[in-house]
Amino acid sequence: MKKVLVISKREFDKVMRDNKITAENIENRSKVAFISINDTFGTTETPFFKEDKENLRILFFDDVTEDTKLNWGTAKAFNKEQGKIVLEFLNKIKDRDTLIVHCHGLS
């Protein structure tokens, strides 16, 4: 992989729209891969994509070290299974030119 771009969700959504990348054609982007990191709570925004693709992984976790019960629900931590998913995905896409990663932090 030659380049990794880390951007906000807002910028990610804009890049997808500006480049006319959709769930139907994302796999045609043979030189690019994507990781979409989303919160599990506290947002009315939905992920740009709904399901994993050959070159896309969608993850849901919150900015906590361990699952944490709060007044409104449970914040979910990044876990070992998600770590394995990311590692397997990175191994699978290692020959792609670019990886674009976004997270849903406040932007």
Residue ranges and their predicted role:
Residues 39-42, 64, 106:
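Short, solvent-exposed loop/turn segments at secondary-structure junctions
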Residues 1-59:
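Glycine-rich, flexible N-terminal cofactor/catalytic loop recognition
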Residues 55-100:
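Helix-loop module immediately N-terminal to the HCX5R catalytic loop
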Residues 99-107:
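A phosphate-binding catalytic loop at a beta-strand-loop-alpha-helix junction
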